[in-house]
């Protein structure tokens, strides 16, 4: 799922982006309202996580303009304002859900999953590769019908590779998706996650392209 995050608090924004990427989502992060509007014009997103108090253009203005144009992109509003009138204003402007700061990252992740299911009217499609199944809605992974326990970043890496089956993703792309701009990433972190996935799912699933990165081949028809 592709998510646009519009949040000007750098510490909070980095944490949200990292948390959503652990869910296997692709996140584009902007820090002001004008950049958010430009991103919405030039690209398509499955969800907008929108802070109300953005510089240059407020989140409510962006939301009203979005709905005025007839765009139905689901919107989760973030705000430090906790008065009922503020929540009503956000929802009346077209928001699908509302989260007041400070909040727990687990709650944000759960609201994003629920909002996506609710607005699409169906569960998120499962990712299937032979006997391997990954359910984005429940985070369950099964192999030949048996549940497989994965660590959060193992799950995020597997989902990313399955969503891009047939492609080769570089180590830098994978690090950016899983860790963002965090500076404390071990140089062999991706290799370690791949090793663990191969141990749990078999050596043939993830292909190494030396000097480039990793990929999962498209399943045979």
Curated annotation (Swiss-Prot):
It comes from the Bacteria. InterPro entries: CheY-like_superfamily (IPR011006), OmpR/PhoB-type_DNA-bd (IPR001867), Sig_transdc_resp-reg_C-effctor (IPR016032), Sig_transdc_resp-reg_receiver (IPR001789), WalR-like (IPR039420), WH-like_DNA-bd_sf (IPR036388). It is found in: Cytoplasm. Residues 124-218 bind DNA. SMART domains: REC, Trans_reg_C. Residues 2-116 form the Response regulatory domain. GO terms for cellular component: cytosol; protein-DNA complex. SUPFAM superfamilies: C-terminal effector domain of the bipartite response regulators, CheY-like. Induction: By cationic antimicrobial peptides and by Mg(2+)-limiting conditions. GO terms for molecular function: phosphorelay response regulator activity; transcription cis-regulatory region binding. The keyword Phosphoprotein applies. Disruption phenotype: Deletion leads to transcriptional alteration of multiple genes including a large number of genes involved in metal transport, such as the feoAB operon involved in ferrous iron uptake and the mgtE and mgtA operons involved in Mg(2+) transport. This is Response regulator protein PmrA. It comes from Pseudomonas aeruginosa (strain ATCC 15692 / DSM 22644 / CIP 104116 / JCM 14847 / LMG 12228 / 1C / PRS 101 / PAO1). Member of the two-component regulatory system PmrA/PmrB that plays a role in the regulation of resistance towards polymyxin B and cationic antimicrobial peptides in response to limiting concentrations of Mg(2+). Functions as a transcriptional activator by direct binding to a cis-acting sequence upstream of the target gene promoters including lipase lipA and pmrH promoters. Also autoregulates its own pmrAB operon under Mg(2+)-limiting conditions. Keywords: Cytoplasm, DNA-binding, Phosphoprotein, Transcription, Transcription regulation, Two-component regulatory system.
